[in-house]
Design a protein with these regions (language model features):
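FabD-like malonyl-/acyl-CoA
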Residues: 1-141, 270-300
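Non-catalytic positions within long, well-ordered alpha-helices that form the structural scaffold/packing
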Residues: 77, 183, 264-265
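Short, solvent-exposed amphipathic alpha-helical segments in soluble enzyme
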Residues: 22-23, 147-149, 183-185, 286-289, ...
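Alpha/beta catalytic cores of group-transfer enzymes, especially the acyltransferase/condensing modules
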Residues: 10-12, 39, 101-251
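Cys-dependent protein tyrosine phosphatase-like superfamily
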Residues: 1-2, 220-230, 235, 244, ...
Length: 313
């Protein structure tokens, strides 16, 4: 009977997130103040007041979600609950690494802000795109990407989220062509995503190289809680392996389905999504229907999850 804490990635942000927890818990306020200090501008104000047009910029979204997620984790910890294993989706992996003692919180806030900047600068606006492909088998998605790659331009599968949901990314024309072909091949839907860059695609390689320079400047520790890496779907605890996997992750697919399978294999029966939204809860439900699921993003969900965790002690 083990518990995993999992941390969300980009797309889960919303103006007003964490406001009630910020008002109720000094530790939440402290984390937001530390984030403001690390960034040199008020991410708190952006989270609570917006505007949304600024919050959705990846260089802001990334530190905002990381701060909100780590703050939720601190509240669980203050209440006496810690996980047996952690993982995070894309950006969420950094939140998981703070929880596992691998990264110092303020370092992580600064690094993900830079990660956002570098990802945005790697591909000019409008030149890259992402699309979610629903209900088409993994093999077919990969095969069509390969065909389009050989004829139109760079495109690849970049998020294996759960059965029936895979995200592709690359050059805009190639992504549009691949999405069209996937619909013809029987995909239930192929939806272009409102993102500003083709995250986790090969086009992010310049960002990965610059990210490595940032990671080289900060302290990276061995994990004190096992962490499941996005790029392999396997457990890592060694500092240098973790650092390498973060660099690789910027320009390679997120194997979320494999990450969840690894946690289940580790003995996990309960997943708690720590941070804004319930995206990962939805994925987990589709990957394994046997799991008990909870989340923490505000006071009502926190109270419910504390009851749930007390009940299974």
């Amino acid at each position: 009977m083990k518990t995993a804490f999992v941390f969300p990635g980009q797309g889960s942000q919303k103006v007003g997130m964490l406001q009630d927890l910020y008002n109720a818990y000094p530790i939440v306020k402290k984390r937001f103040e530390e984030a403001d200090e690390a960034l040199g501008y008020s991410i708190s104000k952006l989270c609570f007041e917006g505007p949304d047009t600024e919050l959705v910029k990846t260089a802001n979204t990334q530190p905002a979600i990381l701060t909100a997620s780590v703050a939720c984790y601190e509240v669980l910890k203050e209440n006496g609950f810690t996980p047996d294993i952690v993982g995070g989706h894309s950006l969420g992996e950094y939140s998981a690494l703070v929880a596992a003692g691998v990264l110092n919180f303020k370092d992580a806030v600064y690094v993900v802000h830079k990660r956002g900047e570098y990802m945005q600068e790697a591909v000019p606006l409008g030149k890259g795109a992402m699309a979610a492909i629903l209900a088409l088998p993994r093999e077919q998605v990969v095969e069509i990407c390969q065909q389009v790659n050989d004829t139109v331009g760079s495109v690849q599968a970049v998020n294996f989220n759960c059965p029936g949901q895979i995200v592709i990314a690359g050059e805009t024309a190639a992504v549009e062509t691949a999405a069209e072909k996937m619909k013809e091949a029987g995909a239930k839907r192929a939806v272009m995503l409102p993102v500003s860059a083709p995250f986790h695609s090969r086009l992010m390689e310049p960002a990965a190289a610059r990210l490595k320079e940032e990671l080289d400047k900060i302290q990276v520790n061995d994990a004190n809680i096992p962490v499941v890496a996005n790029v392999t779907g396997k457990i890592l605890t060694n500092a240098s392996d973790i650092k390498d996997s973060l660099v690789t992750q910027a320009a390679n697919p997120v194997l979320w389905e494999d990450c969840v399978a690894e946690m289940v294999n580790f003995g996990v029966t309960r997943f708690v999504e720590v941070g804004p939204g319930k995206v990962l809860t939805g994925f987990t439900k589709k990957i394994n229907k046997e799991m008990e699921l909870a989340n923490v993003e505000d006071i009502p969900s926190l109270e419910k999850t504390l009851e749930f965790l007390k009940g299974v002690r």
